[in-house]
UniProtKB/Swiss-Prot annotation:
One of its GO terms (cellular component) is cytosol. Pathway: Carbohydrate biosynthesis; gluconeogenesis; Carbohydrate degradation; glycolysis; D-glyceraldehyde 3-phosphate and glycerone phosphate from D-glucose: step 2/4. Belongs to the GPI family. Catalyzes the reversible isomerization of glucose-6-phosphate to fructose-6-phosphate. InterPro entries: G6P_Isomerase, G6P_Isomerase_C, Phosphoglucose_isomerase_CS, SIS_dom_sf, SIS_PGI_1, SIS_PGI_2. This is Glucose-6-phosphate isomerase. The active site is at E346, H377, K506. It is found in: Cytoplasm. Keywords: Cytoplasm, Gluconeogenesis, Glycolysis, Isomerase. Its EC number is 5.3.1.9. It comes from the Bacteria. The gene is pgi. The lineage of its organism: Bacteria, Pseudomonadati, Pseudomonadota, Alphaproteobacteria, Hyphomicrobiales. It is an enzyme of class 5 (isomerase).
Length: 541
């Protein structure tokens, strides 16, 4: 594998100098040769520097890197998360074929199906009004309390699928900052509100602090006895859930082989299911399952997650591009970049290989983005003319949900196409100068101004096109990126499924709380921390 990486690196200088405009001019079939589809989902990677030689090397890299072997180990239930001795089986949660999936010799599918059925019954009962609040009123608002994977996935998917909402209004609280829950509680009435507390251990500080605030909101308004009618939980800590006052019939579990950032398919998706209904939630799972099958069955050169991961690795570890911009041209995907930020950076933000040695080269990139066209008026300037090359990943639906606003969607499509073309072709000095002189600028001034209007081009982008953002399409898109992260992690030779990097700060925060509360001295901390504690204490008085 290292030899192939070195071969790729030996072409890096030439690759960076690749004139994509010339490449398209020389090859009328470039788009068809460097794009792949899964049903209506098209992935166009022709506007990257990938050519026939690089593609062959990337395919060989996947073979020698053991991506296919690791892929089958994941799907078969092997404990590939070796630092926690856990299988990685979020794919089992959307295993619509219902074929057996074994963990330690036991088929997990009966349990998966049982939880999914229980979720469906509960969601239907809330949506229909069969399950009411303590005063007999139907539930009109659902507030999910969670953080990280227990929040980002449900928030993102619920926003994305707004046209399919036909249940109670959905709200989400994550931040321990009291302002977050305070602002949400102003929008709802206690009598008609259901809280879902999502915490596997029921000990997550942010979640349980907000849950206690929510509990007080209900108890003070409706009495202690009302708590059981206004809460549900997604957790495995049944004793702690019972102590909180939540009926065991309203508790939905999941398993240690489901990582938080991969948990939207599990009971963590309950608020989404309540919003869009069990049938649409099933279609969401169907879309992901279709990508799982495609990932396992399609040859590398026709395999969307494989190609996306290989190109991502190439950009990061061969060409050295440090970031990746996620640019959905769909306002309802406004939280998709943040969702992928956690998925990618928490998975592949590692500095140690599976052997316990330092990573050779780079691991995962910084992932960020905003929906278009908003980003065009914010940070695209740097993507087009800045000194850093930032690979961009665009996504656009051919059809929107507002036929009466078709013209606006056509404007949206024209913008995303223009951005990908502009990044590829750029604008030469001669073109910039001619544009200025055609407007009447004299030659000398045009020579001075034109450099500021030059776009170097040759900036890589990938574009995804699909029919419409349905539950099926969203499930497909998420699973595509999950498997992309997996492919890159295998090539980085890291464990993509633990997250020890989140622990140290949490541990230190626990020790600092008594200091912040004034119960302990800050003397054992560094001078910066001592100074910050003192400054905050002074302002708080």
């Amino acid at each position: 594998m290292n030899a192939i990486v070195e071969q790729l690196k030996s072409t890096a200088a030439a690759t960076k100098a690749t004139d994509l405009r010339a490449a398209f001019a020389a090859d009328a079939q470039r788009f068809s040769r460097f794009s792949v589809s899964l049903d209506d989902l098209l992935m166009d990677y022709s506007k990257t520097a990938v050519n026939d030689e690089i593609l062959k090397l990337l395919v060989k890299l996947a073979e020698e890197g053991g991506v296919e072997r690791k892929r089958e180990e994941m799907f078969s239930g092997k404990a590939i998360n070796f630092t926690e001795d856990r299988a990685v089986l979020h794919t089992a949660l959307r295993n619509r074929s219902n074929t057996p999936v074994l963990v330690d010799g036991k088929d997990v599918m009966p349990d998966v199906n049982a939880v999914l059925a229980a979720m469906g019954k509960f969601a239907d009962d809330i949506r229909s009004g069969a399950l009411k609040g303590a005063t007999g009123k139907a539930i009109t608002d659902v507030i999910n309390i969670g953080i990280g994977g227990s929040d980002l996935g449900p928030v993102m998917a619920t926003l994305a699928l707004a046209p399919f909402h036909d249940g109670p209004r959905a709200h989400f609280v994550s931040n321990i900052d009291g302002a977050h829950i305070a602002d949400i509680l102003k929008l709802v009435q206690p009598e008609t509100t259901l809280f879902i507390v999502a915490s596997k251990t029921f000990t997550t500080v942010e979640t349980m602090t907000n849950a206690q605030t929510a509990r007080s909101f209900i108890a003070k308004s409706l009495g202690e006895a009302a708590v059981q009618h206004h809460f549900a939980a997604v957790s495995t800590a049944l004793d702690k859930v019972a102590a909180f006052g939540i009926d065991s019939a309203r508790v939905f579990g999941f398993w240690d082989w489901v990582g938080g950032r991969y948990s939207i398919w599990s009971a963590i998706g309950l608020p989404l299911m309540i919003a869009i209904g069990p049938e649409n939630f099933g279609k969401f799972l169907d879309g992901a399952h279709a990508v799982d099958n495609h990932f396992r069955q399609a040859p590398v050169t026709e395999n969307l997650p494989m190609l996306l991961g290989l190109i991502g690795f190439y950009h990061r570890n061969v060409l050295g591009y440090p970031t990746r911009a996620i640019l959905p041209y769909d306002q309802r995907l406004s939280r998709f970049p943040a969702y992928l930020q956690q998925l990618d950076m928490e998975s592949n933000g590692k500095g140690v290989t599976i052997d316990g040695t330092p990573v050779d080269g780079n691991s995962g990139p910084v992932v960020w983005g905003e929906p278009g066209t908003n980003g065009q008026h914010a940070f695209y300037q740097l993507i087009h003319q800045g000194t850093s090359i930032i690979p961009a990943e665009f996504m656009i639906a051919a059809n929107a949900f507002e036929p009466e606003l078709r013209h606006q969607h056509q404007l949206l499509i024209s913008n995303v196409l223009a951005q990908s073309e502009a990044l590829m072709k750029g604008r030469t000095f001669a073109e910039a100068k001619k544009q200025l002189t055609d407007k009447g600028m004299d030659d000398k001034k045009a020579d001075f101004i034109a450099p500021h209007r030059v776009f170097t081009g040759n900036r890589p982008s990938i574009t995804f096109v699909y029919d419409k953002l349905t539950p099926y399409a969203l499930g497909r898109l998420i699973a595509l990126y999950e498997h992309r992260v997996f492919v890159e992690g295998v090539l980085f030779r890291i464990n993509s499924f633990d997250q020890w990097g989140v622990e140290l700060g949490k541990e230190l925060a626990t020790g600092l709380l008594p200091v912040v509360e004034g119960k302990e001295s800050a003397a054992s901390h560094d001078s910066s921390t001592q100074g910050l504690v003192a400054a905050l204490a002074k302002l708080a008085k």
